[in-house]
């Protein structure tokens, strides 16, 4: 519900600028709460802004030198509190809140935020309704990890009795959703991944896989030929991951040459 009370915490679900770029401004509009024994100037400083919470990998990524041509992230957008491991849990306004780390998915620092009593999940970019999964390999993302994260969302969501509604799912981009929307997105991601994996096992090149159009039946809903994340980029990213997962067997001639070399050296 909406309240006039000051914001106490900002949760950064991952490292991307469109999700952390407002951290400093929002934090300055809020106040955190210090312990009862923190008084005077120290206490005032400790409560002057809202806390910014993120997984430790977000802080690690922000602390690295930015890519060429990009400005460093302002220090005020950095998390002030980080957590290690799988999750952080706390009570807030009488409600249990879980911040759950999903590794190696969209990035390596993604978190879900689950409000248990309200039955609301904020997913960050681990789920969207407007595009194919963005796998940021430069920041530790993988397709297999992304699908695992979608399954993790489904582990904590429930439908209502007509299979629509139930747990409210707040995506990183797009409309408010429910469990059924996540199921459809998870199924799409799994089908496309499995198609490309099978093509890789057959020894197809990237261009041959693209010619097969493994996303064709989903393109009207999620596809794009323009922008920072195109359908072609999505396919190529999965292809490269599947090649690492299923490396091509050495050519017979090369194997024979290696065996001969071993024999001559004996």
Question: Which sequence ranges carry the predicted segments?
Answer:
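Sec/Tat-exported extracytoplasmic proteins
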Residues: 2-7, 24-30, 34, 56, ...
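Metallo-beta-lactamase
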Residues: 42-191, ...
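Accessory terminal helices/loops
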Residues: 32-35, 159-166, 175-266
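PEST-like low-complexity, intrinsically disordered acidic/proline/serine-rich tracts
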Residues: 34-47, 58-60, 99, 133, ...
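Active-site metal-binding motif and surrounding structural segment of the metallo-beta-lactamase
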Residues: 1-42, 48-50
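Extracytoplasmic/secreted cell-surface and envelope-processing proteins
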Residues: 18-22, 61-64, 130-132, 178-180
């Amino acid at each position: 519900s909406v309240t006039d009370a000051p914001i106490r915490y900002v949760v950064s679900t991952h490292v991307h600028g469109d999700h952390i770029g407002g951290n400093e401004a929002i934090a300055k509009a809020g106040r955190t709460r210090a312990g009862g024994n923190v008084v005077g100037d120290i206490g005032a400083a400790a409560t002057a802004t809202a806390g910014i919470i993120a997984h430790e990998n977000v802080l690690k990524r922000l602390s690295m030198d930015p890519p060429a041509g990009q400005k460093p992230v302002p220090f005020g957008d950095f998390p002030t509190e980080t957590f290690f491991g799988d999750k952080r849990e706390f009570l807030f306004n009488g409600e249990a809140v879980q911040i759950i780390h999903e590794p190696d998915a969209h990035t390596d620092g993604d978190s879900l935020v689950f409000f248990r009593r309200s039955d609301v999940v904020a997913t960050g970019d681990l789920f969207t309704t407007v595009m194919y999964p963005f796998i940021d390999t430069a920041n530790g993302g993988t397709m297999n990890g992304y699908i695992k994260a979608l399954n993790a969302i489904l582990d904590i969501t429930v439908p209502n009795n007509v299979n629509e509604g139930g747990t409210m799912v707040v995506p990183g981009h797009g409309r408010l959703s429910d469990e059924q929307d996540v199921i459809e997105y998870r199924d799409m991601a799994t089908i496309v991944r499995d198609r490309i994996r099978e093509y890789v096992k057959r020894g197809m090149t990237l261009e041959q896989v693209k010619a097969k159009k493994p996303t064709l039946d989903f393109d009207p809903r999620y596809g794009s030929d323009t922008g920072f994340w195109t359908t072609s980029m999505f396919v190529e990213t999965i292809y490269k991951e599947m090649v690492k997962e299923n490396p091509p067997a050495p050519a017979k001639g090369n194997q024979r040459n290696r065996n001969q070399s071993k024999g001559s050296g004996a």
